[in-house]
């Protein structure tokens, strides 16, 4: 999943994440996090934006302006939900599920609250009521 915020909010988002005591991964250059029994790999450099299709990047830019992105990978949906519940409250940005949806962070959190077992890899938000 990818968390996107306006570029001017980069330090704020990084600060939220770095408070969790990340450790460098000597192999990938990314950062690792072990929290609540889960492992995460994070790319805080923003390089994931280079992988966006032009129309996706336009969608993001039209919504939040010049973006900054954090790529987060983890081992399970429970891990993903836990991380997002810890990081997203108060974030004025977007969540890219990496499964064809980019949603406002507040809406994403609301959907997780109403549908605690939601698996966005298999079910688009438009299927939720």
Regions inferred by a protein language model and the residue ranges of each:
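Acidic (Asp/Glu-rich) sequence patches and key acidic residues
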Residues: 1-129
